[in-house]
């Protein structure tokens, strides 16, 4: 039995501790199932599409307000009051959710289109035309239906099934769906309906008189009516203007007229009766008859919208259930009838009772008014000295928090500025539970000054009143001004009445015995009201006929039912099927039956593939060598085409490509296009191809590319001809941009109707007098174009200047054999080179002009190559061997030579891949070199709608050669190129920093006078190019036009503020734009874009890093310099420049937002607000909760604004919060650890890693206790400490487990943004008495000295009393040429995480160093279970383990623990250098070392929340360790230095001077500016937003080194 109980207890304990795997698995499974159920429940929510454009804040408002829906925000529709408009649909759906589905529902003033779209066939909408806007709104609803149906029709879709019933009902019986009567007079019939009837009123009850509402509901037999309307509690006050901030709307009241409108919008306003709305708000019962009444019940308020419901109540039910056994029933009923008559009359009278008589009802109906008070604000006129007064609603808690605090101010401190400072501070942030800082009270910022004046006056009067009471001052005769001040004092005394009292006092409402009387001004009629009433007419709204659409929908549904028998019918593309039926004019049912027959193999046709992929279709279209037996095979066939001569006789010319837009799979030409004259007078329609989508190309990839190239020429010619025909038809409506590209000649008048920019066009489109359009080859004389008599007009364009596409088509058609292009067997080599790698230079060095051919894309490039090749005076490059691609294609066969040995194509990747294949074939070469850049701008398909598949863009080559040295680009651009190219890109340029950018205020600021641009001017878009040319700039090109060109200086301009797709980080256009210059590039832009970010990154690249990209940088000279200056820092005195604003700017860039905090009163607000704390077992002396008041001396005020806090006052609350956040918040992460054995192994590793081999064993001849050691310890102590030992007899040991607790009054600044949301905990100090320190201090001092003497100081640095110079010496021999990993271990809550295991490790280290067993045991027990006493704050508690922050082993103990921790996890035998100091560590390992999972090991073994960081530079004890090629320099953290300059605890000027000297000591190295660049990089690693900071480093040196100048950083607080 005992064994069973033991086993049961053990199992229970394991379960509680989480060690039972079965229970853990069950818990995980349960958690998983719960999460799945929760997500499934969320997915089942109704889905609502929010199409209107709203901000992120408005998105959160809608999502939080309506959790019942799954809202999808598309942000695709810009509209007025977009949030309110979008919420209208959510409000409608919320109201409809309250109604049982299918129940007859009346939508009062509703939107019948919304119900049709939702498929609600059971809703009837009463939509009376009470105003012109109502008619407009109703027409808009019908337009939305018509638009919806037209979209379905355009997409060959039909009304979905769930909408079909509703649309059928509207098509057949529109009066059943919507009527235009008021709800009170609605004639809708409820025949054949027996269920309950419901109604909804969405923002429509304003116009229904409240006295008629109940009767109207009863007339329609409505069971429950759900309503929603806008309202604000402030309308019950005297305010004539009330804002609804969430929806950006407002109410304006003028007498009984209440106007609703949206702010900052020109939409029409809505006017209602204020008294009528007030009845809906204040009344509870709405009588319907002498028996039934509708009772209003408030539901919820969401986003300025109130929801309520009106339930039908039968009042006769109040007494029908009364028991009457044992009495005379007749007498009972008679008495009840009399009583009921009286009670019913009283109930009807009480139905008008105001709801505000009950305070709980007020809080229920007006939740925003809860805990709000009315505060008067005062103002005075400077001209008339007239005082004015108004009232505002403010949180009661906020008011009394301010008043109670400022009431404690002394007379001298009670000033308006101090009150305003406190009010502004607590309004911006309040400390919650001593942890979180947040804004607690939402008080309008515009009221803070007036409120502060009110609080100040109130407190002044309260102080005066107290003085009068104390002195028992007797009042005598009073002057008028004294009476006025008495009235003000009286108003202040009654500043906070309840809402009810204020309403009654202002006579807004009047309470009578039986009813609520609302007093409003008499009604009046304005001119606008009179005009509307005179011309008001009532007409019936026309009905929208949708019967035809419903019939088409029915046919489509029947066809889809036929198709449902197919396999995978759920994936059937209904849109394509509907489009096919419409284009072929086929009945959907017939088409469906044919498809089913084909797919069921019942049509006699066998399909050769299942999925119509490109590969399957191409395979199916190939001719089969041998058909399978018994199978029907469909193959392509040759189709005879009419001859060219026959076509010319009819004026037609068929130009379809190899795979054009006709059904045949291939073409064979019986006759070829022999000359360009065959194009003359061909009809334009024969050249225009409306459908540019090719069928599948067949053959190898190169053949497919060549076919696609021919098709692209056809498409380009077709587009050019089509545009010219359109110009001829629309000459009178040509915009300015089109006029620059086209020209139209009137033949009769010989005058250009639209003058072209070019002259002597080669061809054009002619319009004859018969309104026919033909393509004509043009001839010119001295008067212009030679025309014919039957020509009416001639149109030309920039594409018709030359016969480009026509001549290319003629040439390529001659090359086809049986309709198929031939592929060359020549070897194709791709030379992939970076920008400026010398591709043209290499071509000229390799080419043999006698037997090779060079082809380039542009004429300028061809002329440049000829000029460079013939520079020696010998003509070797001619127009026969250096040609443009277009010239070669257009004039093929006309030159003297047709065959070449080698072909060189410059910028070949800018060409169509099919064009490159044709060039290789036409040159008849043995090898072709295609020079290009895979990362620059590729071939761009200029014909919209013409397909150029992605796999066609890749050129098939036999070999790839790379060129990765740029002769053009400066070093910073080369740095960018290394991010885009594989392999190392190098440069030969001596320029390092060449790129810059400038943000311009707008496109208008770019003009030649105010902004002359240097060098070549480039743009990204043609529109920007034209804009610059029109403003007077010369020689402007786009980036695409200058690819391959080189310029010394470039000015890149962007004038387009809208997003441009080609401006992206990985865009080839950006790459080309950055690589055109050799000296400088400046980017002028009107908006921030990725290129600005790239240039800013390049500006920050250090110069020494850019030297790595130079190919001509030798290493021998560097090695010689390195050997001379080894271990010595270059010293360059830092100039003393800068100002205070430099330090402020740098601080704000690194820590944005910290300097704006108003945290001077954080400690005050924590004491003033309620607080809830979770504490461990402790004893609190509550008599210490109220600190004794102290005179606070003013401190110096810093000019540099940082997040530094004011010193805090020690007290119960402050000390307890610090203890909770520090000592009571220790992590528990460790797993199961064998403490003694593991500690022994860790210490073994510690001694093997850090101690010299000969000193790993303790010196037995060494005594820890000696007079010398005690004298050394005493010499380090202060006289006060020694005086405390005077009465110590040293007979017995004091209580070693007793500690004292205190806090540091000055909070430690964190160099992050946590101060914006957190209340930093003070550092706690737990320390022994001096008597214990006198015993163990000398002991551990000797142990520490012995340990440090044994450490391998060449590799390890235990930072104890080391100067920055000693740190520099330690790291000075690091070889910067050896790649290293710089590691930092960051441990959170280091002291409080240490438990029994850490103590065991530390005790084992001390034991091995020679600590005696007895003292070791005493020390161990003194750190096991310890008692903490805080006498100042009145706190006593017990702690287990933890590092005590004030005993004699705090620093060295933390140091050996962090060193032991790292030795147990990292391969210390590979370590190059390592430094340890408290919880800080810095390690240098060789690059590429493998490390274990540090986080897991630190958690499970060491109970540490640890993170391991890899960095370029080390950060150690608040200092940056910068290693370089000459040694090492240690810079104090400049951001930490600036943070200290914002200190708010400096007492006086003497204290400030001591403060300056201490900062000078730690920041001495900043005087050396030689390594500021590396310091910038180091700071940038920690603070990503930090700018280059040499200016601020110099500023710090300037102020720290000058005593007088340093005083200007602070102001005297006593004089402020």
From Swiss-Prot:
Chain intervals for the UniProt region annotation (Methyltransferase): 50-458
Consequence of substituting residue 1100 to Q: In ToMV1-2; overcome tomato Tm-1-mediated resistance thus leading to increased infectivity in resistant tomato plants
Domain Alphavirus-like MT: 72-281
CDD domains cross-referenced by the UniProt entry: Virgaviridae_RdRp
Transferase among keywords: yes
A single GO BP: DNA-templated transcription
Domain RdRp catalytic span(s) in chain numbering: 1380-1493
Record field: catalytic activity: RNA(n) + a ribonucleoside 5'-triphosphate = RNA(n+1) + diphosphate; ATP + H2O = ADP + phosphate + H(+)
Domain (+)RNA virus helicase C-terminal: 964-1116
Activity regulation, free text: In resistant plants, is bound by host protein Tm-1 (e.g. tomato Tm-1 AC A7M6E7), thereby inhibiting replication complex activity.
Consequence the record notes for mutating residue 349 to A: Loss of RNA silencing suppression activity
SUPFAM superfamilies: DNA/RNA polymerases, P-loop containing nucleoside triphosphate hydrolases
Record EC number: 2.1.1.-, 2.7.7.-, 2.7.7.48, 3.6.4.13
Taxonomy, superkingdom: Viruses
Single Gene Ontology MF annotation: RNA-directed RNA polymerase activity
Chain segments carrying region Helicase: 830-1085
Record-annotated (+)RNA virus helicase ATP-binding domain positions: 801-963
Subunit structure: Heterodimer of a large and a small subunit. May interact with the host proteins TOM1 and ARL8. Interacts via an ATP bridge, with host protein Tm-1 (e.g. tomato Tm-1 AC A7M6E7).
Other information: This protein is translated as a fusion protein by episodic readthrough of a termination codon. When readthrough of the terminator codon TGA occurs between the codons for Gln-1116 and Gln-1118, this results in the addition of the RdRp region to the replicase.
Full protein name: Replicase large subunit
Organism: Tomato mosaic virus (strain L)
């Amino acid at each position: 039995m005992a064994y069973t109980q033991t086993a049961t207890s053990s199992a229970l304990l394991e379960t509680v501790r989480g060690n039972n795997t079965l229970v853990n698995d069950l818990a995980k499974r349960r958690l998983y199932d719960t999460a799945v159920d929760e997500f499934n429940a969320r997915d089942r929510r109704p889905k609502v599409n929010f199409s209107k454009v709203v901000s992120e804040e408005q998105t959160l408002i809608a999502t939080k307000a309506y959790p019942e829906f799954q809202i999808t925000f598309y942000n695709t529709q810009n509209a007025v009051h977009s949030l309110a408009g979008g919420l209208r649909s959510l409000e409608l759906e919320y109201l409809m959710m309250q109604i049982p589905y299918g129940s007859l529902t009346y939508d009062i003033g509703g939107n019948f289109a919304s119900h049709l779209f939702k498929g609600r066939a059971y809703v009837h909408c009463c939509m009376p035309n009470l105003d012109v806007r109502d008619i407009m709104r109703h027409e808009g609803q019908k337009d939305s239906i018509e638009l919806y149906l037209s979209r379905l029709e355009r997409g060959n879709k039909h009304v979905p099934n769930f909408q079909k019933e509703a649309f059928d009902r509207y098509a057949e019986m529109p009066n059943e769906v919507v009527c235009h009567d008021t709800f009170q007079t609605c004639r809708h019939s409820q025949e054949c309906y027996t269920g309950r009837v419901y109604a909804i009123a969405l923002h429509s009850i304003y116009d229904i008189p409240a006295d008629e509402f109940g009767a109207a509901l009863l007339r329609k037999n409505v069971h429950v009516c759900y309503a929603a309307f806008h309202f604000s509690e402030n309308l019950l006050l005297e305010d004539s203007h009330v804002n609804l901030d969430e929806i950006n709307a407002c109410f304006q009241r003028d007498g009984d007229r209440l106007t609703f409108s949206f702010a900052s919008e020109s939409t029409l306003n809505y006017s209602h009766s204020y008294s009528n709305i007030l009845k809906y708000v204040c009344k509870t019962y709405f009588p319907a008859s002498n028996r039934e009444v509708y009772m209003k019940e408030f539901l919820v308020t969401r986003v300025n919208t109130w929801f309520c419901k009106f339930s039908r109540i039968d009042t006769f039910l109040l007494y029908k259930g009364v028991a009457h056994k044992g009495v005379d029933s007749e007498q009972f009923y008679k008495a009840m009838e009399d009583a009921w008559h009286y009670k019913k009359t009283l109930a009807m009278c009480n139905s008008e009772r105001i709801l505000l008589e009950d305070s709980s009802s007020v809080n229920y109906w007006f939740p925003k008014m809860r805990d709000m008070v009315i505060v008067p604000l005062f103002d005075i006129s400077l001209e008339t000295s007239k005082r004015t007064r108004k009232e505002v609603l403010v949180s009661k808690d906020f008011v009394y928090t301010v008043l109670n605090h400022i009431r404690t101010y002394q007379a001298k401190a009670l000033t308006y500025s101090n009150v305003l400072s406190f009010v502004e501070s607590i309004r911006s942030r309040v400390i919650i539970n001593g942890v979180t800082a947040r804004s607690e009270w939402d008080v309008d910022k515009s009221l803070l000054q007036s409120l502060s004046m009110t609080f100040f006056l109130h407190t002044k009067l309260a102080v005066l009143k107290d003085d009068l009471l104390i002195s028992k001052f007797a009042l005598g005769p009073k002057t008028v001004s004294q009476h006025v001040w008495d009235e003000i004092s009286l108003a202040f005394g009654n500043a906070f009445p309840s809402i009810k009292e204020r309403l009654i006092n202002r006579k807004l409402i009047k309470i009578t015995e039986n009813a609520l009387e609302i007093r409003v001004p008499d009604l009046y009629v304005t001119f606008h009201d009179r005009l509307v009433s005179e011309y008001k007419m009532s007409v019936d709204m026309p009905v929208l006929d949708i019967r035809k659409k419903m019939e088409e929908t029915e046919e489509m549904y029947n066809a889809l039912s036929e198709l449902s028998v197919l396999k995978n019918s759920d994936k059937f593309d209904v849109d394509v099927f509907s489009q096919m039926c419409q284009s072929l004019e086929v009945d959907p049912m017939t088409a469906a039956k044919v498809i089913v027959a084909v797919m069921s193999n019942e049509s006699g046709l066998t399909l050769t593939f299942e999925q119509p992929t490109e590969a399957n279709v191409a395979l199916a279209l190939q001719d089969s060598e041998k058909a399978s037996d018994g199978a029907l095979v469909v193959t392509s066939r040759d189709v005879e085409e009419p001859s060219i001569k026959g076509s010319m006789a009819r004026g037609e010319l068929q130009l379809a490509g190899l795979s054009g837009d006709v059904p045949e799979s291939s073409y064979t030409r019986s006759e070829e296009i022999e000359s360009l004259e065959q194009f003359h007078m061909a009809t334009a329609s024969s050249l225009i191809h409306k459908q540019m989508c090719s069928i599948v190309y067949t053959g190898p990839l190169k053949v497919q590319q060549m076919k696609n190239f021919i098709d692209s020429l056809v498409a380009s010619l077709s587009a050019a001809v089509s545009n010219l025909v359109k110009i001829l038809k629309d000459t009178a409506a040509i915009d300015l941009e089109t006029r620059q590209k086209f020209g139209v000649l009137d033949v009769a008048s010989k005058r250009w109707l639209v003058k072209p920019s070019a002259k002597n066009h080669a061809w054009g489109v002619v319009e004859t007098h018969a309104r026919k359009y033909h393509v004509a080859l043009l001839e010119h004389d001295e008067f212009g174009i030679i025309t014919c008599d039957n020509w009416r007009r001639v149109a030309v364009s920039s594409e018709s200047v030359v016969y480009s596409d026509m001549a290319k088509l003629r040439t390529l058609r001659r090359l086809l054999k049986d309709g198929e292009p031939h592929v060359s067997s020549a070897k194709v080599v791709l030379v992939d080179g970076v920008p400026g790698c010398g591709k043209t230079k290499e071509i000229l060095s390799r080419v043999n002009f006698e037997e090779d051919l060079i082809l380039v894309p542009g004429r300028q490039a061809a002329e440049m190559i000829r000029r460079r090749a013939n520079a020696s005076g010998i003509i070797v490059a001619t127009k026969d061997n250096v040609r443009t691609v277009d010239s070669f294609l257009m004039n093929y066969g006309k030159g003297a030579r047709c065959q070449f040995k080698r072909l060189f194509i410059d910028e070949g990747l800018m060409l169509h891949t099919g064009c490159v294949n044709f060039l290789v074939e036409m040159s008849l070469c043995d090898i072709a070199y295609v020079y290009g850049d895979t990362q620059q701008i590729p071939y761009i398909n200029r014909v919209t709608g013409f397909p150029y598949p992605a796999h066609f863009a890749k050129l098939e080559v036999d070999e790839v050669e790379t060129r990765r040295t740029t002769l053009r680009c400066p070093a910073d651009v080369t740095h960018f190129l290394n991010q885009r190219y594989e392999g190392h890109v190098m440069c030969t340029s001596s320029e390092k920093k060449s790129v810059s950018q400038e943000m311009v205020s707008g496109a208008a600021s770019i003009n030649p006078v105010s902004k002359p641009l240097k060098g070549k001017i480039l743009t990204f878009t043609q529109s920007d190019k034209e804009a610059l040319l029109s403003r007077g700039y010369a020689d402007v090109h786009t980036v695409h036009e200058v690819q391959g060109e080189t310029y010394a200086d470039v000015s890149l301009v962007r004038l387009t503020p809208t997003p441009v797709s080609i401006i992206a980080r990985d865009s080839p256009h950006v790459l080309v734009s950055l690589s055109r210059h050799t000296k400088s590039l400046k980017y002028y832009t009107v908006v921030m874009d990725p290129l600005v970010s790239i240039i800013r990154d390049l500006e920050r690249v250090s110069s020494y890093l850019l030297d790595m990209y130079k190919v001509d940088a030798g290493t021998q000279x560097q090695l010689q310099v390195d050997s001379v200056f080894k271990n010595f820092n270059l010293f360059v005195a830092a100039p003393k420049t800068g100002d205070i604003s430099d330090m402020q700017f740098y601080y704000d860039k690194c820590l944005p937002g910290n300097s704006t905090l108003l945290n001077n009163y954080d400690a005050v607000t924590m004491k003033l607000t309620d607080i809830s704390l979770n504490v461990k077992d402790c004893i609190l002396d509550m008599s210490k909760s109220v600190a004794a008041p102290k005179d606070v001396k003013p401190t110096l005020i810093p000019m540099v604004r940082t997040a530094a806090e004011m010193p805090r006052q020690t007290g119960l609350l402050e000390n307890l919060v610090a203890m909770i956040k520090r000592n009571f918040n220790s992590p528990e992460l460790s797993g199961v650890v064998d403490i003694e054995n593991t500690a022994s192994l860790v210490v073994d590793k510690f001694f093997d890693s850090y101690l010299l081999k000969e000193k790993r064993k303790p010196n037995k001849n060494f005594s820890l206790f000696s007079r010398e050691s005690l004298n050394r310890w005493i010499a380090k102590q202060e006289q006060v400490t020694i005086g405390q030992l005077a009465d110590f007899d040293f007979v017995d040991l004091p209580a070693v487990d007793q500690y004292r607790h205190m806090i540091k009054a000055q909070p430690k600044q964190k160099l992050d943004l946590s101060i914006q949301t957190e209340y930093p905990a003070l550092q706690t100090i737990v320390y022994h008495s001096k008597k214990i320190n006198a015993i163990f201090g000398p002991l551990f001092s000797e142990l520490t000295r012995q340990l440090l003497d044994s450490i391998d100081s060449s590799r390890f640095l235990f930072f104890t009393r080391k100067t920055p110079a000693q740190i520099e010496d330690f790291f000075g021999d690091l070889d910067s040429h050896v790649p290293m990993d710089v590691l930092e271990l960051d441990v959170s809550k280091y002291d409080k995480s240490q438990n029994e295991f850490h103590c065991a490790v530390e005790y084992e280290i001390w034991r091995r160093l020679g600590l005696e067993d007895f003292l070791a045991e005493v020390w161990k027990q003194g750190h096991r279970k310890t008692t903490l006493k805080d006498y100042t704050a009145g706190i006593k508690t017990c702690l287990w383990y933890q590092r005590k922050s004030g005993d004699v082993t705090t620093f060295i103990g933390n140091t050996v623990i962090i060193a032991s921790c790292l030795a147990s996890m990292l391969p210390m035998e590979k370590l190059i250098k390592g430094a340890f100091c408290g919880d800080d560590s810095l390690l240098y390992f060789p690059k590429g070392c493998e490390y274990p999972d540090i986080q897991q090991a630190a958690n499970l073994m060491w109970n540490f929340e640890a993170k391991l960081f890899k960095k370029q530079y080390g950060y150690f004890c608040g200092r940056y360790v910068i290693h370089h090629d000459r040694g090492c320099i240690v810079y104090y953290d400049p951001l930490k230095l600036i943070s200290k300059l914002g200190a708010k605890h400096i007492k006086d000027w003497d204290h400030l001077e001591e403060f300056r000297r201490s900062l000078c000591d730690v920041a001495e190295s900043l005087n050396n500016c030689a390594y500021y660049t590396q310091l910038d990089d180091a700071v940038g690693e920690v603070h990503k937003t930090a700018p280059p900071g040499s200016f601020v480093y110099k500023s710090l040196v300037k102020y720290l080194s000058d005593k007088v100048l340093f005083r200007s950083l602070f102001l005297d607080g006593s004089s402020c």
